[in-house]
Amino acid sequence: MVAAGAGVTQLLVLLLMVAAVPSRARGSGCRVGAAARGVGADGHEAEGCGTVALLLEHSFEIGDGANFQKRGSLLWNQQDGTLSATQRQLSEEERGRLRDVAAVNGLYRVRVPRRPGTLDGSEAGGHVSSFVPACSLVESHLSDQLTLHVDVAGNVVGLSVVVYPGGCRGSEVEDEDLELFNTSVHLRPPGTAPGPETAAFIERLEMEQAQKAKNPQEQKSFFAKYWMYIIPVVLFLMMSGAPDAGGQGGGGGGGSSR
């Protein structure tokens, strides 16, 4: 009996250990897996850890056409609401093309997919984009600020880009100042819209009605309130005007007899 009880105890301990192993593996798998493999540009690995990636693309072409190419990735940590960026260096050909576009007052465009964690345009539900004059980006030495606007469902609804200090003054820029982007990124969560003041209006209306019910005198018209003052004044005017009218009539008759 003692041996059987010891065997049952060992079996229970073994089962508890086996049950505890998967939970620890699941808790550490997100951290270890992400650290070992890194966060891919498609965001699928990061999505399981609460972080999604958005492919950041840019285009700078002479003319109205756009040819978007990868600039980097925006990493959105949905758990703590932070946003960071990883970006690649511009090649010599890209730096020259950016200068050419700036010389003709062309545009520099950026875009991200509407749905985080997707690459293909059809799966991403389209893109949101923004632009600045290419000359202002060149003269800012590639210093810009990206602001990502998202909704409550986690979709991207807007993207804005601002360069510092901004403006096109024709300043000379060294080629080495156009190699790396100096970017700050900000996440703009959905704001709480002010609700209608229906409840306050109804409450104020009920208070006014209750006040009128307590003071019914306030609901009377002007004449109903002050009739006792108006009638004596009218009677006084009528009585004071009657003798004057009689006197004027008598005087007129005497004049006609002559």
From Swiss-Prot:
CDD domains: EMC10 (cd22209)
Similarity annotation: Belongs to the EMC10 family.
Membrane-related topology note: Single-pass type I membrane protein
Function: Part of the endoplasmic reticulum membrane protein complex (EMC) that enables the energy-independent insertion into endoplasmic reticulum membranes of newly synthesized membrane proteins. Preferentially accommodates proteins with transmembrane domains that are weakly hydrophobic or contain destabilizing features such as charged and aromatic residues. Involved in the cotranslational insertion of multi-pass membrane proteins in which stop-transfer membrane-anchor sequences become ER membrane spanning helices.
Induction of synthesis: By glucose in pancreatic islets.
Keywords: Angiogenesis, Endoplasmic reticulum, Glycoprotein, Membrane, Signal, Transmembrane, Transmembrane helix
Carbohydrate-modified residues: 182
Lumenal side: 26-221
Chief place where the protein resides: endoplasmic reticulum
One GO BP: positive regulation of endothelial cell migration
N-terminal signal peptide: 1-25
UniProt note on tissues of expression: Broadly expressed, with highest levels in pancreatic islets, testis and bladder. Present in the islets of Langerhans (at protein level).
Annotated gene: Emc10
Ranges facing Cytoplasmic side: 243-258
Location(s), subcellular: Endoplasmic reticulum membrane
GO CC annotation: EMC complex; endoplasmic reticulum membrane; membrane
Bilayer-spanning residue ranges: 222-242
Organism from which the protein derives: Rattus norvegicus (Rat)
Subunit structure comment from the entry: Component of the ER membrane protein complex (EMC).
Protein name stated in the entry: ER membrane protein complex subunit 10
